[in-house]
From Swiss-Prot:
Species the sequence originates in: Orientia tsutsugamushi (strain Ikeda)
Superkingdom field: Bacteria
Family to which this protein belongs: Belongs to the bacterial ribosomal protein bL25 family. CTC subfamily.
Keyword Iron attributed: no
The protein, known as: Large ribosomal subunit protein bL25
Record has rRNA-binding as a keyword: yes
Record GO biological process: translation
Keywords, comma-separated and alphabetical: Ribonucleoprotein, Ribosomal protein, RNA-binding, rRNA-binding
Alphabetical list of Gene3D superfamilies matching this protein: Ribosomal protein L25, beta domain, Ribosomal Protein L25, Chain P
Length: 207
């Protein structure tokens, strides 16, 4: 499991656009904690503190201990809204994580590795990333920071499907029945391959 991050917040009782704007003028971010079966918990936190966490690697898959007044919540980031110009964090939603070893749905980043060794990229292709995250069901104490995907042996024109990912023990895809594409190596079709095949054939004919 990732190292747990910490954040301090306050409960808020005023809602709506004007209230949210007032909080932002004070350097605070309105937020909501969600969990199926409970009433949403409205909170606010300091924008500068949220921004520090937001810039950390693997933010979306890291459990945060959120201290709200005299209560503590273990949460995962669900959605972050940024100002379109200033990139100030305007709003943040959290998911209250399952307790006592429960199974948690979480959005985990995909880390594409082996680009420097990729045969397809060396031959003029480039990596077209379709999905940067994968939705998993994980034990709360085994949420991975990221899921690695080795593309070293992926040729030009090949697609990489979600079934290629090696998931940690106990973690499963939310959509098990759909083997969707997460990336592909695209570029000029293998002119170089044809030239190499021609060279090989010439060599064979000369023997």
């Amino acid at each position: 499991m990732n190292e747990m991050l910490t954040l301090v917040g306050q409960l808020r009782s005023d809602f709506g656009t004007s209230s949210a704007r007032a909080l932002r003028r004070q350097g605070k971010v309105p937020g909501v904690i969600y969990k199926k079966g409970i009433t949403p918990i409205h909170v606010c936190t300091l924008e500068k503190e949220v921004a520090k966490l937001y810039r950390k690697p693997f933010f979306s898959s890291t459990v945060i201990q959120l201290q709200v007044d005299d209560q503590r919540f273990k949460v995962l980031p669900k959605a972050v809204q940024l100002h379109p110009v200033t990139e100030f964090i305007n709003h943040i939603d959290f998911i209250l994580v399952e307790q006592n070893g429960g199974i948690q749905k979480v959005k985990v980043p995909i880390s594409f590795e082996g680009k420097d060794k990729s045969l397809g990229i060396k031959r003029g292709g480039y990596l077209n990333i379709v999905k940067r995250y994968v939705d998993l069901l994980c034990p709360v104490d085994k949420i991975p920071q990221c899921i690695k995907c080795d593309i070293a042996n992926v040729p030009v024109g090949a697609s990489i499907k979600v079934s290629r990912l090696e998931l940690p023990e106990g973690c499963n895809l939310v959509k098990r029945t759909t083997d969707y594409v997460i990336a592909s190596v695209i570029g000029k079709s293998s002119k170089q391959d044809k030239e190499e095949e021609g060279t090989a054939e010439d060599g064979a004919d000369s023997k």
